[in-house]
């Protein structure tokens, strides 16, 4: 997987790291109208830089999105095999790690997995979770007879990877509690409260801590 006729270093050569705040990585497929969900997520997250991750087949769609992003730095990237989960996952990690090297914190990297193959979306999601990215989103809505989201009905569904980490920690805290390891349980419950603001998860952590 590589950038379009350039390297990551060349793409970012004249971009001032000190001004960077948020980056958005979008999977790009070949369907009709797929540019709208991508542009919607750009409007929502207001990133300084957008990575359009697609395939050779979706190059035309990528160019269509680029044409509408005049004031945003855009980097093009291509999956070598959009149906190979292992390769897509490794290439997704590479995108995130390159952004990290260029000054972005993982928590300031967001992903839109609406378009592209299911494998591409899954790979980007797994990469986002493994690196603790800010959040990843999916643009849903009412669909027409061809299965495409009808313009004007879009709604953005988001999930923060930190919520997944918090749920895992909460499960471990319960395990420690059941084994009378109260000190370890208390530490994990405190970490859970620092990871997420999800009311249900926080309340469970506080309850376990209270009876600990």
Task: Show which residues each predicted segment covers.
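Intrinsically disordered, low-complexity N-terminal tails
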Residues: 113-115
């Amino acid at each position: 997987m590589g950038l379009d006729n350039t390297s990551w270093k060349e793409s970012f050569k004249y971009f001032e790291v000190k001004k960077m705040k948020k980056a958005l990585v979008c999977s790009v497929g070949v369907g009709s109208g797929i540019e709208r969900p991508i542009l919607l997520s750009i409007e929502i997250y207001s990133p300084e830089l957008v990575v359009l991750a697609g395939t050779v087949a979706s190059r035309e769609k990528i160019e269509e999105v680029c044409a509408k992003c005049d004031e945003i730095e855009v980097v093009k990237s291509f999956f070598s095999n959009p149906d190979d989960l292992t390769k897509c996952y490794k290439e997704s990690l590479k995108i995130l790690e390159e952004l990290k090297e260029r000054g972005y914190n993982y928590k300031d990297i967001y992903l839109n997995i609406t378009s592209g193959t299911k494998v591409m979306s899954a790979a980007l999601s797994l990469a986002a979770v493994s690196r603790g990215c800010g959040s990843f989103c999916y643009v849903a809505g009412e669909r027409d007879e061809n299965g495409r989201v009808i313009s004007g009905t879009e709604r953005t569904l988001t999930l923060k990877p930190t919520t997944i980490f918090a749920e895992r920690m909460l499960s471990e805290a319960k395990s420690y509690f059941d084994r009378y390891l109260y000190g370890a349980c208390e530490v994990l419950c405190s970490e859970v409260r620092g990871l997420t603001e999800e009311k249900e998860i926080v309340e469970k952590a506080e309850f376990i801590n209270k009876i600990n």
